[in-house]
């Protein structure tokens, strides 16, 4: 035996493989206020005990590796390791468990969602001992939250900038999403804003393609904004998508938007990446731009119930990284979204303090301290008949976005915008008068049709449209 080996042995190093649960499963651990807490849905491989699976998640997402290493003796594992501190079965699922893991705050770089996710959901999702793994929720402690800027402006500052109060904001995604020239695109923007919408929007995959380069689009959309503002007396905006192939190009586009004097830009935060998103968010705060966030690619990550990451985690990450709006499903439209679960992460986006509520999928109490809120955006397959439900579900602090539900109006874009604005104003007035939108919604819309031919035409076109498909990602215990 060499002297080196003898030295290592003499300080207690023992090579080999040992069970994770001997080090990382600590049911006696009392969580600290500064810990980041995670709730994982764990599906172990056959023969792997849930305690070992939960401990493996804690180890592989913090300080552990597959074998004992002598450099463990050069640090304090008790200080830095993740700990699986509780395991509970999932109701109705024999092979699934919720494993709760606590991570010491010093494991993470300040102000970096990128680093936080690299640790917590980095390698561990490919771990062979697990058949599947899903991150259901995170508790971000105030000590970590305070290292982030968060949304560039937040809900109240946005309302003050736009001078719009007491109702949801109305938007529209310009369709067809690809193929229009910049001038025709700007014309559609003008018609929608002139008809009564607050915002129009680039679709997520509108960047700078051969048929419409970004600079041309920005110029024609700015012209549409200023013309519609002059005619209506209302502040208008268009979400100019600054997403690009490099961070430098993205910022260049945001700079041009600022020079044009428009109020808001847009970013695809998952395809663009958290580092790019945080950089753009900082630029927007420094330069007075609102930031609209699209969640393109989210369903790749969050739709399957037993593997991936729930959208409530992506929503929390966005609030840290920064954005003033984010798409949050509709409950009633064409895209996936369970009602209680959606309302849970909508509250996590908007409110300062959210209590633990498992009936809405919220595993931890979340205190956002002074971090501004984010407006949830309801978008995808919605039309005027959905307006009462959307107003009731999302409340005033939201953006209701009708793409086909505006541009598909039989009389054109501007009448489509008029129909949506009239429907919204009717629902808000009825709610303020004490009427129940959930019960009387259709009647309220029919009454408004009597004095708005544009709304009457829209109601006739979409009276039979339904998206009656079951939700894939339901809360536990739901049939």
Curated annotation (Swiss-Prot):
The modification Phosphoserine is found at residue 208. The disulfide bond which can form in the large chain dimeric partners within the hexadecamer appears to be associated with oxidative stress and protein turnover. This is Ribulose bisphosphate carboxylase large chain. It comes from the Eukaryota. The modification Phosphothreonine is found at residue 330. The basic functional RuBisCO is composed of a large chain homodimer in a 'head-to-tail' conformation. In form I RuBisCO this homodimer is arranged in a barrel-like tetramer with the small subunits forming a tetrameric 'cap' on each end of the 'barrel'. Its main location: plastid. The modification N6-carboxylysine is found at residue 201. Substrate binds at residues 123, 173, 177, 295, 327, 379. Its cofactor is Mg(2+). It holds the Pfam family RuBisCO_large_N. InterPro entries: RuBisCO (IPR033966), RuBisCo_large_chain_AS (IPR020878), RuBisCO_lsu_C (IPR000685), RuBisCO_lsu_C_sf (IPR036376), RuBisCO_lsu_fd_N (IPR017443), RuBisCO_lsu_N_sf (IPR036422), RuBisCO_lsuI (IPR020888). It comes from Capsella bursa-pastoris. Its EC number is 4.1.1.39. Heterohexadecamer of 8 large chains and 8 small chains; disulfide-linked. The disulfide link is formed within the large subunit homodimers. It is found in: Plastid, Chloroplast. Binds 1 Mg(2+) ion per subunit. The keyword Cytoplasm does not apply.
């Amino acid at each position: 035996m060499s002297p080196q080996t003898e030295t290592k042995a003499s300080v207690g190093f023992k090579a080999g493989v040992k069970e994770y649960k001997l080090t990382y499963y600590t049911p006696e651990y009392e969580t600290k206020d500064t810990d980041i807490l995670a709730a994982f849905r764990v599906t172990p491989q056959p023969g792997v005990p849930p305690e070992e699976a939960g401990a493996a998640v804690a180890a592989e997402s913090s300080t552990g590796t597959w074998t004992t290493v002598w450099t463990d003796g050069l640090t304090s594992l008790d200080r830095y390791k993740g700990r699986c501190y509780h395991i509970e079965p999932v109701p109705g699922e024999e092979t699934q468990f919720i494993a709760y893991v606590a991570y010491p705050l010093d494991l993470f770089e300040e102000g970096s969602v990128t680093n936080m996710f690299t640790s917590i959901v980095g390698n561990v999702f490919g771990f062979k001992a697990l058949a599947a793994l899903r991150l259901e929720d995170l508790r971000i402690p105030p000590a970590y939250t305070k290292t982030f800027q968060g949304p560039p402006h937040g809900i109240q500052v946005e309302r003050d900038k736009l001078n719009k109060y007491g109702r949801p904001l109305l938007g529209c995604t310009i369709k067809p999403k690809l193929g229009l020239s910049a001038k025709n695109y700007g014309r559609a923007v003008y018609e929608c804003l002139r008809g009564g919408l607050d915002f129009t929007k680039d679709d997520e995959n509108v960047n700078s393609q051969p048929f419409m380069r970004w600079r041309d689009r920005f110029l024609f959309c700015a012209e549409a904004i200023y013309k519609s503002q002059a005619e209506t007396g209302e502040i208008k905006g268009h979400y100019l998508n600054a997403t690009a192939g490099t961070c430098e190009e993205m910022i260049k586009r945001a700079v041009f938007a600022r020079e044009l004097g428009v109020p808001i830009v847009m970013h695809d935060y998952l395809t663009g990446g958290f580092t790019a998103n945080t950089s753009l968010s900082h630029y927007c705060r420094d330069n007075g731009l609102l930031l609209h966030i699209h969640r393109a690619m989210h369903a790749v990550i969050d739709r399957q119930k037993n593997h991936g990451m729930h959208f409530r985690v992506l929503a929390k990450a966005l609030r840290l990284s920064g954005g003033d709006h984010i798409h949050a499903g509709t409950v009633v439209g064409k895209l996936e979204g369970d009602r209680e679960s959606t309302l849970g992460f909508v509250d996590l986006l908007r409110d300062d303090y959210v209590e633990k509520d498992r009936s809405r999928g919220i595993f931890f109490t979340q205190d956002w301290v002074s971090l501004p809120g984010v407006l949830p955006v309801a978008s995808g397959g919605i039309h005027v008949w959905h307006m009462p439900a959307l107003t009731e579900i999302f409340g005033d602090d939201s953006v209701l976005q009708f793409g086909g539900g505006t541009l598909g109006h039989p009389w054109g874009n501007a009448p489509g915008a008029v129909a949506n604005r009239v429907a919204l104003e009717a629902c808000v007035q009825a709610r303020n008068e004490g009427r129940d939108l959930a019960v009387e919604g259709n009647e309220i819309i029919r009454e408004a049709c009597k004095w708005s031919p544009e709304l009457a035409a829209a109601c006739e076109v979409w009276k039979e449209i339904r998206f009656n498909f079951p939700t894939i990602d339901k809360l536990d215990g739901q049939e």
